[in-house]
Amino acid sequence: MKFIIKLFPEIMIKSESVRKRFVKILTGNIRNVLNKYDDTVAVVKHWDYIEVRSKNIENRTLLVELLGRIPGIHHFLEVEEKPFVTLHDIFEQTLSDVATQIENKTFCVRVKRKGKHDFSSLDAERYIGGGLNQAVASAKVQLSKPDVTVRIDIENDKMMLIKARHQGIGGYPIGTQEDVLSLISGGFDSGVSSYMLIRRGSRVHYCFFNLGGATHEIGVKQMAYHIWKRFSGSHKVRFVAINFEQVVAEILEKVDNGQMGVVLKRMMVRAASKVAQRFGIQAIVTGEALGQVSSQTLTNLRLIDEVAESLVLRPLITHDKEQIIAKAKEIGTEDIAKSMPEFCGAISKSPTVKAVKEKIEQEESYFDFSVLESAVQNAQYLDIRQIAEQTKKEVSEVDEITVLSANEVILDIRSPEEVDDKPLEISGQNIILMPFYKLSSHFAELDQSKNYVLYCERGVMSKLQALYLREKGFDNVKVLNKIS
């Protein structure tokens, strides 16, 4: 099984030294991601493409899914490589592969060629296309918008019949740009802004300001872990949790109501700047969009940035909410975001849209900054890969079982792609498919007289979701530790 990885076009127009560095980094990223699932994978870089080979045909669907999420890949081709001697050899091998595909359909042949041959690409297209047209009586050549396009790459003495073309997410390989720290709240905006910086080649770390207790933290961890695992699993990243409840209490007690929103954001930026400095991170990322809420006017954003000791990036600054939600749906964070309450907007009833610097500074003079310093000093730093281990401790009150009884219902909370790749089949057992990101909105609709056993491949999401549901008041949940 072989894939040809085509690079993001912006990589190809870089200088030779930069392009080589980007391709080297992308090759390493692909290897890091795929080797976790298939130890037979070989990744080889070439001048303008990367070659991926695997001996495990059964992993095809999984590898296609994984490659489609790695930043830096524009698209990739699933190919079958064969040797040839003459142009007629190419025709015969193509015929055996595509004859059934072009029956009763229109088709055309497209050839790309490298190396020295006694025929041109156009000669090959005409010869192979004419042969297919004669050999398959019900097929008809049509050069414009055919039903089937037969694509063949010829390089020296080998032909590659392109079986399928898959789209990548584009962008730059992770590690080609500096690290950033994303202020993630669990909502639509912060998840999408994190993804956009990942796609642009930055390793994204996460900073979470806890305003809503354990339930809030669990939901945000779910989102951060999902984004990391899906799009940036090639790299280690940090998850930083800062308890901001006392900071909010101080603001509510001492700051004028209309100024609270801007003051809170300034406190968050101050804290995030300290975290960024500690780890040598170059920039802070937020999900703010111009005019979306009262604190996101140009005047207020300028005042917020004044206290930043790091560059503040706002990739969504010109995006509409509709665009942001559509992107959240595309990357798989929409349902998590839907279940997340908006804490920041709840602390001020009459927020100012045009804050005055002197007024903000006057209000902040009443604030006890030792509360902010204490919150930063007591921040929790976690390797995002350790979320599973930490969750084990946090969900100790949730039963983990290895043997199922007849009256227990399994909730398979894996994504639809994972379920398709490895269906869970247990004889005599009732299994309900409900992706983890739909639990918060759909679990209450289930028959609550039954006990539900949550299952996922590695146990991370099932434990997080079990704790989340317990926090919501559902006691009828357990975790499937191992299939028996």
Swiss-Prot record:
GO terms for cellular component: cytosol. Residues 61-165 form the THUMP domain. Keywords: ATP-binding, Cytoplasm, Disulfide bond, Nucleotide-binding, Redox-active center, RNA-binding, Thiamine biosynthesis, Transferase, tRNA-binding. Pathway: Cofactor biosynthesis; thiamine diphosphate biosynthesis. ATP binds at residues 183-184, 265, 287, 296. It is found in: Cytoplasm. The active site is at 456 (cysteine persulfide intermediate). This is tRNA sulfurtransferase. It comes from Histophilus somni (strain 2336) (Haemophilus somnus).
